[in-house]
Amino acid sequence: MAKKVAGQLKLQVKAGSANPSPPIGPALGQRGINIMEFCKAFNAATQEMEKGMPIPVVITYYQDKSFTFIMKQPPVSYFLKREAKIQSGSKTPGKAKAGSISKAQIRTIAEAKMKDLNAADIEGAMAMVEGSARSMGLEVTG
């Protein structure tokens, strides 16, 4: 018989650095999930990834206090900042430019994020990534 799902929890955790301190510990603890078990499993799963990369994770927890988790790709903003080599986006996106990014870089990001985006094809995914870039104050070139 299948386990009965008690709920789902969405978190964004840095790769390889899940620990029981806030915000992870309290979020899992109040739902009765074994915090250390999650931290060990998550850190093992993200061992090969770039340390500190923000990873969205969806945790499904069951009534018997067990859990499973699904990791997604890092946010588009993380990829954009990394490709444009900037620390943060523009505080006034319409007026001040934070940097620039090429269409080829946008295509690379769209291909990496394709399975997480709600897009039918690569052009749709590129349009979404391009919109995110503009809202961060990045100039799209080429």
Swiss-Prot record:
InterPro entries: Ribosomal_uL11, Ribosomal_uL11_bac-typ, Ribosomal_uL11_C, Ribosomal_uL11_C_sf, Ribosomal_uL11_N, Ribosomal_uL11_N_sf. Signal peptide: none annotated. Pfam families: Ribosomal_L11 (PF00298), Ribosomal_L11_N (PF03946). One of its GO terms (biological process) is translation. Belongs to the universal ribosomal protein uL11 family. Part of the ribosomal stalk of the 50S ribosomal subunit. Interacts with L10 and the large rRNA to form the base of the stalk. L10 forms an elongated spine to which L12 dimers bind in a sequential fashion forming a multimeric L10(L12)X complex. PANTHER family: 60S RIBOSOMAL PROTEIN L12, LARGE RIBOSOMAL SUBUNIT PROTEIN UL11M. This is Large ribosomal subunit protein uL11.
